[in-house]
């Protein structure tokens, strides 16, 4: 996931720096890009970091660097210019997922320590969402997607016909009070169990007392998220807890009845980019079941 670029919190960029150093020691050039699928028209706001490495002695590596007019003998300023060209125009990601340089984009150029152990102990770097590493030299800058095509939304992948009753949420499980209430404060008075087992409570903002493992009492708080997912936007990132009683589970308004329900299996398949009924059949000992 994209937080790899910033981990750990006490030594920003160390973990990704170790990965890059290992690739460097094996003779690879590495490009990376944080890509949100929805920013290129897909039906899910799923953000992940993609890493592509290629051996320095391959034809592919030589072709990329030739197009960018890169030379190992360049001074840092010239190297930075050519490495930026790889990121924006000539590199692996640039052709399939085009980007522009962000306005007032922050740029970072840095050398990896020679020893991987030193990277682990001392290295830190403010990695941006795009970058390249060659021979231990890192160049990274913030980019923005360049896409003007069709945008698939959650509404586009929702079923339009009759949906099985098992997916609909009973009214008493939706709300415990006025539907306009989006927060709860349980610091002084805890809500009844029945209220806490509603989607309104789960997705709403809340404050409540908790006790840590060492006995320290503290206030836990979290903000509200949208109760009903909007059909005119791509779906949120779908997790393995989808469909369960979870804060991250999608809730939608059924297109035929207008009632509130969970996503169907078919809709979750579509959000993940699979064909309709992808999981309906499978092969067992050569037979379709």
Where in this protein do the model-derived segments appear?
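Conserved Class I SAM-dependent methyltransferase catalytic core
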Residues: 1-54
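Glycine-rich nucleotide phosphate-binding loop and flanking beta-alpha elements
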Residues: 3, 58-59, 245
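Short glycine-/acidic-enriched loop or helix-start segments at secondary-structure transitions
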Residues: 6-9, 62-63, 249-250
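Intrinsically disordered, low-complexity coil segments
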Residues: 11, 59-75, 79-80, 255-259, ...
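Residues that form generic nucleotide/phosphate-binding pockets
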Residues: 22, 80, 126, 190, ...
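Flexible, glycine-/basic-rich loop-and-beta segments that form/coincide
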Residues: 42-144, 151
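C-terminal target-recognition/interaction regions appended to catalytic cores
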Residues: 130-289
